[in-house]
């Protein structure tokens, strides 16, 4: 019955495509879906977004042949919550990927985290199965590493990659090296079977991830619609690239990583064209959060004209590069000023498959097909959360900050700075400043760097405040926060003995189990 419903809805979508002058011919076949998610890549890292060295020819061509979003946002300024939001279509405050351990703290999933994606959340690959999709994740999962959080338990059919970031190397005594999985079992660990040379920056991981993507596309292209989630992490510090790309960028080691990713994406798009499935494959490129300026320039990217970076709810922390490519459907050379969100990829992907989101829960993602296919703009807010705290909201061109904070004085004095060289008096604060009674409001069109707040006495301020306040009140009145998943840590749950370790002789002995509150210092 579900297959019949899916087919019926796909036929309805075909009628929409035909009405837009972009119809398909032959039997109804939902398009393949390919989501390219980068790690800590900034808005200003692509040539098409103004990066002066212009070392991303394939991504720039993807933009020229498709649609570019200059106003596209992650759902959080950190990796894990943003990825959970993409795959659920829901804000982290709704899907549980936040902490209540301290006010306005960011949180993610290091290997000592106890929590992960709850079974109650319905992920995109689970829902796409109803329309016959085969799904694979390549790269970084980051939604929990314990067995109950495994991606194959949440709808994916295949996985090659890791549950955590590639930090290390560790001594396998105080802390284990991070495992790499093929499907259900580990096949090695970072810095062991999958070496990363921290001194030179050399690692072959992006090439491995590229081959995994190419092989999957070749196997599936003629049989079933596929969903490929390509979540590479070469641009997350410590950044890496394979030997042919090392030393090739004007931007140092980070630029080498970007160049290799760009080359890989070019090869993926070329394969789609060679297999004659490009016109039946929707491709979307974006990043999980802003560039980590604390690691720049050698280990971090650029957020263009925007303030601060990863870890913050200023534009540099959550405004992302975003490109849509679907030959024959998305008109080439478009720029859309639609406010977009990473959560929209959930709802849009379901619409492409002829499916609708679950009706028993709040969904924050919009269906962007009217924008992609017909150029329509839709009103919507962007909410900027840090932990369980709504820090800011954007509506139209205006952004209101209810709280401001970069990082604590304690960490700042230790050299941790998420806004290096970007001090804005009264805005980039090292104390958590409460503006809820009189928010700071910026016009992002005139002031994308959030340096000049509107005068409280101006008519523009009063009008913007009224509109944003109304939307925020509606949001907060309807909000039902999920149980926080990122509160408890325990060294005993780290990657000591992942599934498959016995076959490799890689099992390690865990320490005593001592659950405790995670310390989120920022």
Curated annotation (Swiss-Prot):
Effect the entry attributes to changing residue 415 to V: In MPS4A; loss of enzymatic activity
Consequence when changing residue 257 to T: In MPS4A; severe form
UniProt PTM comment: The conversion to 3-oxoalanine (also known as C-formylglycine, FGly), of a serine or cysteine residue in prokaryotes and of a cysteine residue in eukaryotes, is critical for catalytic activity.
Record annotation: effect of changing residue 291 to T: In MPS4A; severe form
GO MF annotation, one: arylsulfatase activity
Taxonomy, superkingdom: Eukaryota
Result, substituting residue 214 to P: In MPS4A; reduced enzymatic activity
Effect of residue 204 to K: In MPS4A; mild form
Documented effect of changing residue 135 to R: In MPS4A; severe form
Mutation effect (residue 259 to Q): In MPS4A; mild form
Record: glycosylation sites: 204, 423
Resulting phenotype, residue 343 to R: In MPS4A; severe form
Residue list for modification 3-oxoalanine (Cys): 79
Residues at the catalytic site: 79 (nucleophile), 142
Localization terms from the record: Lysosome
Keyword Metal-binding: yes
Segments for region (Catalytic domain): 27-379
Pfam families recorded: Sulfatase, Sulfatase_C
EC number(s) stated in the UniProt entry for this protein: 3.1.6.4
Designated name of the protein: N-acetylgalactosamine-6-sulfatase
Species assigned in the record: Homo sapiens (Human)
Highest classification ranks of the organism: Eukaryota, Metazoa, Chordata, Craniata, Vertebrata
